[in-house]
A protein has these predicted regions:
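Gram-negative outer-membrane beta-barrel domains
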Residues: 4, 10-13, 17-191
Length: 191
């Protein structure tokens, strides 16, 4: 029992300086989103916001957490699926992610890092028909929430003491054989 108390006290002592070195940030981002399902892929524009905290640790390293809310214009439609003139579409909608970042301070103004964590995407599907079916409906839409994991890497440059720009590559793999490759540029502020 004493060993557990000693370990907890030691962890608390080391956590206090880490919290004191915490750096909060928020960013807006945009870039290329390539959504894939099965063998098909469709590119679109990815946009969103992220916020997080980085904690400096000894040796020029840092560890952090980041939450992201994004959306995409990636959409793929096929025509004449069940009848002439109909259309079936699949589109990548909102994307939520919570990741842990680990990296190194390359210089006073640059960071190189990798990250990984959980992601949840909403995928929309729709079917439009020029004729009414037996129930009187010609259109149908549905949304599916897919859980998955995200991995990636990034490079961040401080423009001023509070303003930064960064570039990231993100790979997300979800249920139902759905994945995304994203190249993102972000501009943010530290506070």
């Amino acid at each position: 029992m004493k060993k557990i108390a000693l370990l907890a006290a030691s962890a608390a002592l080391f956590a206090v300086p880490a919290i004191a070195n915490a750096q909060a940030y928020v960013q807006v981002e945009g870039g290329l989103d390539v959504a894939q399902q099965g063998g098909d892929s469709e590119a679109g524009f990815d946009y969103g916001v992220s916020a997080g905290y980085d904690y400096q640790i000894p040796g020029g390293m840092f560890v952090g957490i980041q939450g992201t809310y994004g959306d995409s214009t990636a959409r793929d439609c096929v025509h004449d699926v069940a009848e002439a003139g109909d259309r079936s579409c699949l589109e990548a909608n909102r994307d939520l992610a919570a990741v842990v970042r680990v990296g190194t301070q390359m210089s006073e103004k640059t960071k190189l890092y990798v990250f990984g964590g959980y992601t949840n995407a909403r995928v929309g599907s729709s079917y439009n028909s020029p004729s009414l079916d037996a129930t009187g409906f010609s259109d149908a839409t549905a949304h599916h929430d897919l859980d998955g994991f995200r991995l990636g890497a990034g490079y961040e440059v401080d423009v001023t003491s509070t303003l930064f720009v960064k570039a990231e590559y993100r790979y997300s793999n979800y249920e139902s054989d759905f994945s995304r490759h994203q190249g993102v540029i972000a501009v943010g502020t530290k506070f």
